[in-house]
């Protein structure tokens, strides 16, 4: 229920705002969502924000149900789900349907992270690059 209220507030905040002004407002909301986090959730969200900014600079920064998220053409590609949001023992990095992660008949769309390590960053960088790649039909 809280997530639905957050999503409604996100939509209200950008109602009537278009173009670059809307993207700027959404990017500010993404940074505010990250800054509102604490501890490990914040550390992971901050580092993931850097990864997305560097590996997929064309993705727009916004919030989605209160989560820091990154989108193309208004469709969320990837997001951070803080552990504190649902009282879980790990933060999740999620990828939505428009992420280009297809790998045969089965692939993961969510990854648990309990600590930001060089190995985790390397894997997430590769996932973000792949997820953000524009699909080519053929």
Spans of features found by a protein language model:
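Charge-dense, helix-prone N-terminal extensions
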Residues: 1-138
């Amino acid at each position: 229920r809280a997530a639905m209220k957050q999503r409604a507030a996100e939509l209200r905040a950008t109602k009537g705002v278009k173009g670059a002004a809307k993207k700027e407002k959404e990017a500010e909301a993404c940074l505010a969502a990250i800054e509102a986090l604490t501890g490990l959730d914040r550390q992971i969200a901050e580092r993931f924000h850097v990864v997305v900014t560097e590996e997929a600079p064309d993705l727009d920064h916004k919030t989605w149900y209160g989560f820091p998220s990154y989108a193309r053409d208004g469709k969320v590609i990837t997001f951070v789900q803080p552990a504190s949001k649902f009282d879980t023992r790990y933060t999740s990095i999620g990828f939505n349907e428009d992420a280009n992660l297809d790998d045969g008949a089965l692939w993961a769309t969510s990854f648990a992270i309990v600590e930001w390590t060089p190995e985790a960053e390397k894997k997430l960088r590769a996932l973000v690059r792949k997820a953000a790649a524009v699909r080519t039909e053929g």
